[in-house]
Every structure is written in structure tokens, then in C-alpha cells.
Design a protein with these regions (language model features):
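AAA+ P-loop NTPase nucleotide-binding core of proteostasis motors
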Residues: 1-330
Length: 330
């Protein structure tokens, strides 16, 4: 166990607790990421295959391209996977691809060549993976990266390793590689429809939307890159039911924080959640405006009530709606 803590390598192979965790992987992910059943199913199947030991031993556990509009849960799913697989959200290495837009930024990834400044430090990506070989690597907004950066990714996806500037081999075989992109987001938010039939079959709708997105993706990425990815997953835009569930999760977090930090037992009524969805949701921007709405309408008002002395530490507080505003009763 001590060695496992030092090296960050789970020493025990598929033991009982991990097989139980893998069995429930899709259920665990569904608790955190709302309204993306297809994405969760595809992801958990590939991860189960990889962790059981059926994958190609020379390649990463899985490589995925997540496509979808902003705020639908692409990054959240990566965090949830890191926590479900390796037991900690910290085991996600996030690489923001907007930092790798220039040609010379390749050296930032694997380290500067000998004689250049920073040669001793190693690369930003290679060092992180070397120190944390069991992790989820998230390449955020992959379409922004320079073509030379893609060449490094091709090697990782194919051979499962890269050699850094100091000649050390960095092993990617125990990582899950996730790339996110907003390519084709317009086709997801505003799918092209023919005729007047509004109530269409959802599955047919999703298939058509996926085909439109894939057309755009094929123009944007090189075929040899797309060919090496295990699964390309298209995320759904969020509907009103999803929004309500997401607000429910966010309110749960506020309730937990109030209990832990202020010893306040806070009860948030359904009418409050409904009010936040009605006033704060925007389909184009997904779940992010909801977090802002929860902050401004619930957290800010609770903070003001605490400062004014209306609510004291250790109180039992109920949040409800009165005259289209959130009010607290003690």
C-alpha cells in the first residue's frame, strides 16, 4: 500500500472492490452527468474492456473524442471518470490546447531540446504522466492545437508511449485519453430538419444530428487522427428535465456546504429549483448559466441573510418562493 501511494500505481490487480466499481461504472457516472446516457454507455464499455485486460497491451486503456456544445458535461464526465476509475478527481491531467497553438509549443509538451532554456525541467505533459501513470488525460478544445501537436498525439494513440527531450520513455498504456471539441456544436443546437413534422423519433433525430456533426469533424481533423480514436461520442443538448436534475445536484452541494461550514440545515423546496430553471436556463449555453443562477439567487441571498443576522449559525432554514423571489424562513 505504501508503494502504491508513492508511485501512484494501483498495485492490486482487479481485486474485489475494483471489479465492483467497474460493474457500477455507468451508474456512478450517471449520478454526476445528467442526460448523456449514450456517452456514458460507450465510455464505460470501453473502460471495462481496457481494465479487465482485453485491450491491446501497447495502447492506452481508451481514447475518446467528445463532441458537443458548451456546458453539456464533456469536462464533467472526464472528472467523474477519473474519480470512478482511480478513486480521485485529482487523477485527471488537464491539458488546455489553446496553449499549444504555435509550432514551437510542441517543446512545451515533451520538453525543450538540449541547449535550450528549460531542458532540465522536462515537458508539461510528459512529466505529469511520468509521475502519475494511472490517470485520465483531458485534451481540452483539441481543434485549437497546432498540427505538429497532433503528430505527438498520433504516436501516443498508436504506440502508447512518447520519448521526452531527455530520452526517457513515458508510458501512456494505463491512461484514458479524452479529447473534447466544440466542432459541429451548431449542428447539435440547431439540427437541420425537413418538412413540418416536429414530433419526430428521438433516435432518428440523434442519428441525423450525429451525421451532420461527423461531416464537420472530418473536414477539421486529419483522417489518420480520427482513425486511431476508439470512440467518437456526440453529446446531446440538455432539455428541461435535465436542467431540473442539474439544479437539484447544485442545490445539494449548497446544502452540504451550509451544513459543513455553517452548521445550518438548509431545505430547498422544489419550487425554488423550478424558479431557478425558469429564470436562469439557456439551452445554447447548457448547464453553466444554471450555476451562475444558483450563485446569484440562492447563495448570495443566503450570504446577505447571514450578514444581516436574519439567519444564525446552527439554524434550520427553509428556502421557498414568495412573489417570484426566493425567501428564507427559519
Amino acid at each position: 500500500d505504501v508503494i502504491s501511494m508513492w508511485t501512484r500505481i494501483p498495485v492490486t490487480r482487479l481485486n474485489e472492490s475494483e471489479s465492483e466499481r467497474l460493474k457500477k461504472l455507468d451508474k456512478t457516472l450517471e449520478k454526476r452527468v445528467i442526460g448523456q446516457e449514450e456517452a456514458i454507455q460507450a465510455l464505460s464499455k470501453a473502460v471495462k474492456r481496457g481494465r479487465v485486460g482485453l485491450k491491446d497491451p501497447a495502447r492506452p486503456i481508451g481514447s475518446f473524442l467528445f463532441l458537443g456544445p458548451t456546458g453539456v458535461g464533456k469536462t464533467e464526465l472526464s472528472k467523474a471518470l477519473a474519480e470512478a476509475l482511480f478513486g480521485n478527481e485529482e487523477d485527471m491531467i488537464r491539458v488546455d490546447m489553446s496553449e499549444y497553438m504555435e509550432k514551437h509549443s510542441v517543446s512545451k509538451m515533451i520538453g525543450s531540446p538540449p541547449g535550450y532554456v528549460g531542458h532540465e525541467d522536462g515537458g508539461q505533459l510528459s512529466e505529469k504522466v511520468r509521475r502519475n501513470p494511472y490517470s485520465v488525460i483531458l485534451f481540452d478544445e483539441i481543434e485549437k492545437a497546432h498540427p505538429d501537436v497532433f503528430n505527438i498525439l498520433l504516436q501516443v494513440l498508436d504506440d502508447g508511449h512518447i520519448t521526452d527531450s531527455q530520452g526517457r520513455k513515458v508510458d501512456f498504456r494505463n491512461t484514458v485519453i479524452i479529447m473534447t471539441s466544440n466542432a459541429g456544436a451548431k449542428a447539435i443546437i440547431e439540427p437541420k430538419k425537413l418538412g413540418f413534422t416536429q414530433q419526430e423519433d428521438q433516435k432518428a433525430d440523434y442519428k441525423r444530428m450525429k451525421a451532420n456533426v461527423m461531416d464537420e469533424v472530418k473536414q477539421l481533423f486529419r483522417p489518420e487522427f480520427l482513425n486511431r480514436i476508439d470512440e467518437i461520442i456526440v453529446f446531446h443538448p440538455l432539455n428541461e428535465d435535465n436542467m431540473k436534475k442539474i439544479v437539484g445536484l447544485m442545490c445539494k452541494e449548497v446544502v452540504q456546504r451550509a451544513k459543513e461550514q455553517l452548521e445550518i440545515i438548509l431545505v430547498v423546496r422544489d419550487s425554488v429549483k423550478k424558479h431557478i430553471v425558469e429564470t436562469g436556463s439557456d439551452k445554447k449555453y447548457g448547464a453553466r448559466p444554471l450555476r451562475r443562477a444558483v450563485q446569484s439567487q440562492l447563495e448570495d441571498k443566503l450570504a446577505e441573510a447571514l450578514l444581516n443576522g436574519e439567519i444564525k449559525r446552527g439554524d434550520h432554514v427553509e428556502a421557498g418562493i414568495s412573489k417570484k423571489e426566493i425567501k428564507f424562513t427559519v
